[in-house]
Amino acid sequence: MSSVAVLTQESFAEHRSGLVPQQIKVATLNSEEESDPPTYKDAFPPLPEKAACLESAQEPAGAWGNKIRPIKASVITQVFHVPLEERKYKDMNQFGEGEQAKICLEIMQRTGAHLELSLAKDQGLSIMVSGKLDAVMKARKDIVARLQTQASATVAIPKEHHRFVIGKNGEKLQDLELKTATKIQIPRPDDPSNQIKITGTKEGIEKARHEVLLISAEQDKRAVERLEVEKAFHPFIAGPYNRLVGEIMQETGTRINIPPPSVNRTEIVFTGEKEQLAQAVARIKKIYEEKKKKTTTIAVEVKKSQHKYVIGPKGNSLQEILERTGVSVEIPPSDSISETVILRGEPEKLGQALTEVYAKANSFTVSSVAAPSWLHRFIIGKKGQNLAKITQQMPKVHIEFTEGEDKITLEGPTEDVNVAQEQIEGMVKDLINRMDYVEINIDHKFHRHLIGKSGANINRIKDQYKVSVRIPPDSEKSNLIRIEGDPQGVQQAKRELLELASRMENERTKDLIIEQRFHRTIIGQKGERIREIRDKFPEVIINFPDPAQKSDIVQLRGPKNEVEKCTKYMQKMVADLVENSYSISVPIFKQFHKNIIGKGGANIKKIREESNTKIDLPAENSNSETIIITGKRANCEAARSRILSIQKDLANIAEVEVSIPAKLHNSLIGTKGRLIRSIMEECGGVHIHFPVEGSGSDTVVIRGPSSDVEKAKKQLLHLAEEKQTKSFTVDIRAKPEYHKFLIGKGGGKIRKVRDSTGARVIFPAAEDKDQDLITIIGKEDAVREAQKELEALIQNLDNVVEDSMLVDPKHHRHFVIRRGQVLREIAEEYGGVMVSFPRSGTQSDKVTLKGAKDCVEAAKKRIQEIIEDLEAQVTLECAIPQKFHRSVMGPKGSRIQQITRDFSVQIKFPDREENAVHSTEPVVQENGDEAGEGREAKDCDPGSPRRCDIIIISGRKEKCEAAKEALEALVPVTIEVEVPFDLHRYVIGQKGSGIRKMMDEFEVNIHVPAPELQSDIIAITGLAANLDRAKAGLLERVKELQAEQEDRALRSFKLSVTVDPKYHPKIIGRKGAVITQIRLEHDVNIQFPDKDDGNQPQDQITITGYEKNTEAARDAILRIVGELEQMVSEDVPLDHRVHARIIGARGKAIRKIMDEFKVDIRFPQSGAPDPNCVTVTGLPENVEEAIDHILNLEEEYLADVVDSEALQVYMKPPAHEEAKAPSRGFVVRDAPWTASSSEKAPDMSSSEEFPSFGAQVAPKTLPWGPKR
């Protein structure tokens, strides 16, 4: 099919250099000189009158018919045959079995082709493949590779032909492999081999080999030749618009590559078949030799700026000179400073060419007009209207304004440029006479104050003095402000701006000292709090120091009064922060932490809220007992008193106040609290609280069990007395492993030293860095005596001795079981003494001890005690029903572990039996035995305890009996509590959380009856000591639930209010803000009707809560409705180009306007029919004020938008092209649409103009079309 393109003159000129001579006619540059346009019939030849395709179906007639291709079927079928000798899988009894079937299935799934297999009489395999062409070819390749035995062969072709076998991106090779169903391996480029390996069937190999050799043979016919030709003669060989070289290429079929003028290469490359290539080379050589003899050169000087006019757009002018005169014009490169242009050609034609070169050079000129850069936008005019007058008269002149330069550049035909220059110079002169500008320096930090809130100050100055004020953006940090306009207005604006700046320079700067730790809190998360302060004091600049500087100075700058107000505000804020950051630590016994937290955190939450403090408790798995309270000092003290009172109520905790002079407190506490900690640990972990340093109080509070408090009081007073009389301290060192031995069992040894000398000995705590240091405090003589005793003990410990003792082998196992637990305990207690028992299996009774002499003796004594216990060991049975065993053991066996430690006994529980109930069935005789034979009598006695109930206790008799009593005391007891059935589910709580919490808190088991029983009785099982507390807790919970039920009944009061659905969104508010506030304020639930529910009244809003609260909420909603009914909505046309600026970043600006005027402003969505329509809703007077305000903003912003758009047009770089008259496009004559109206309209009744259809013609067989 032919195609018709509509070309403008510009695009025609751009493309003609690439067309062959037969396709174009020579055209001149000016459209006026063009030949007559072609007729419509020439441009669009009519189709043949009679379609020959019906008469001659096999040979369609006409140029259009030649292009028709038969439609190919989308699904094809191919059949492949695999001979018996080439089959991979021959040994098959039946088709469809084994590996062959699997392979076919895989091929079908992967390729999407359909396979059908059949066996011929000669046992050859026929495969029919159906599907799309690609799928069939891929399936065929897979079938050959996997069902047919593979052979291989090699073919050698020249290495340089390999790339033609591969083809572009390997496409040729892939295609070849698919066609021949083979695998072709070509050596890598770095491999010198020229052998190509082909793998596949014999038939496929032959085909592939043939194709490869054909490709190689085809390449053998072709040749490449390079011809060196001087660069200067390339234009003659190429010819004007590359026509000459195009002709040679077309006639010889040879490809000729001439390097472009920009590439500094001289060789011309020829590619083609050898004979034609030789002809092409001969013709080029002939042209080169001829031109070399006949041509000569002349050099002329042409201004560098005019070179581009000689070259012309895309080199067209050079081609035009070459075409007209046969002379080549050589222009120096653009980066060269040379202005010499060389003309090369036959002598008689050089004159004409030189004339044309000068004509082209002088056809355009460049001129400049001096104009201050600040006047440029006034010269351009509003929306570019001033310049439009000049450019409309002289469209070929290009006017360029360069930002920052005091000149305007004009470029175009000389006459037009001169006229335009005169006009622009007149405009500049007029503007200079009428206008003035001034530049003033004002510190950039004052610029935003000069601009004012939303540009209020600067806009007032602009309107008042009719001037333009240019303030640089903050990012430039420039101090220069430029004022342009009427000379008088400029001076007045300058005076006012300088006065404002002067006033600001006289502003006060104040340094505020705020501890750096509070800076982050004052700034707030993402700067929220500091933003609030800045909004409160907008005229004050607040600068915080860089965190890396570690500075406490915060700088405030602004008007004196505002700075003072801001200072007071921030000082008050800091005072509140300091006051609220007071912190105290309260030591509370760990077992009472859960009581202080209370049920669901109720107690701790109540204390926090009422005291307005932050209370941090240690983690449950932490060993710390300290609770930290943070807040105001008075509040912290109140919270501490409440927490301590809870502890006091819960246990037998005594509290004693001791008066000790404040000056002794630090010495009593000791370094890092070591001294006071040693007293607290020694006296059963009592809590000793000293008053805050600097308070002047002498009162020290001791809190804990009564006996321990008295003991601690005595020690504290004794220590204080010592400190007051004379305090002396000595440090001695001993290995950490000796410390336990020096302290002795239960602190016996160290107590003996203290009692005998009167000195206090302090050992390091586990967290202390120096673990060797032991401190002795007291009177000098007592300290010296204690030091002497301890050093003697340490010296003895340093003297290592080895001793042995005899231990009956039957007892050895007791010492080494559980990975030598008993031996480890002995080593820890007796200064790291090493005890070695003989290896198991040997009958030796000798045990070796190695360590300090005293330690060895003490260890021997301890081993002897253990042996005596073992020999005096008895076994007692304690019968406790198996169902109570888990309760007796306690969490993770903690209760049993405590009993074994307290009474030094071993306790063994029986194995658990699945059937824990007594069997009522008679005992079955086994092997004819009587019921009692071979069994203990007690097993058969129904009254005796079961084996699974018996707990074995081993140890000394008296200790076993005491342990038995302790175990029996752990057997849980059950009591019943009456709780109304309807409260049971609330007692259980969500997913059992309530009942589980109560069980954990009181360490009991609570059994709630099944719902179907409708019983009011709840059973509590646990230790007798815990039952009373659990019962009281349960009854307390019942009281709470009953109170909640009553409260729920009161809260369920419902009230309906009728409100028009159109007001619902306003009542709900943005993101539900309004309705949420009403809900929270009145503590009610407000339900709006469901829009999708047609049965529900859409104007009913339901309020649920206390009766008084629902009525208050109803009144609040009706107030909003009343306000909304008074509101009006008005549409205002607002240019869409300024919408974004009015809305502001993230809607900040529009929100400010809406808040200021108390209106709602809605902008059109993208794609709206009227993009300029903005809706304002609110009270009538507010709507009017808001509309006036946004229309003022529109006028101000629109001026900037228009100026910016106009400037953009003239700030673009010039297109260095010849100016042309407006294009006429593609023109034809005698087109149907140009027929004169006088022509007669077609006669619809005429049979000639509208012939009737003849009789139906019998259809003829066509080469393609629908199936018959």
Swiss-Prot record:
A matching Pfam family: KH_1
Phosphothreonine modified-residue sites: T8, T295, T296
SMART domains linked: KH
Signal peptide per UniProt: none
Keywords, sorted A to Z: Acetylation, Cholesterol metabolism, Cytoplasm, HDL, Lipid metabolism, Lipid transport, Nucleus, Phosphoprotein, Repeat, RNA-binding, Steroid metabolism, Sterol metabolism, Transport
Residues carrying Phosphoserine: S11, S31, S35, S317, S645, S1247, S1252
Bias (Basic and acidic residues) ranges: 932-944
Modified residues (Phosphotyrosine): Y437
Modified positions (N-acetylserine) in chain numbering: S2
Spans traversing the lipid bilayer: none
Chief localisation class: cytoplasm
Role played: Appears to play a role in cell sterol metabolism. It may function to protect cells from over-accumulation of cholesterol.
UniProt protein name: Vigilin
Protein source organism: Homo sapiens
